[in-house]
């Protein structure tokens, strides 16, 4: 893992990468090894921290191993726990507002956050966002959101 990140983000990345490795081992019915380098393309002078990137890192790792293509129209946020559950994150309204301002059409968020975002709330952000709730990384690993 390369880039300016705090301890909480580093731990979140390690959890996401471990879960992705376990998911692949289950799929392949054997232990598999991949060399994946996670690089944060961010301002080097700013320290980034927090667990919100866990789901995005998991999806990126799975995509690297399975050859999934990513879409610039999809944004992801969510903390991933060691059991694979995806839990609520803070600042969700600001994240949705920024997504609506960009070219984002679909946002994957923790189910707990999706339930609190009423349609009228994110329409107020000025965008037409398709907000999808995720409760466990298996939903992504099984391809429920693949191709979005």
Task: Please annotate each region the language model reported.
Residues 1-148:
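Peripheral, non-AAA+ core regions of ATP-driven protein-machinery
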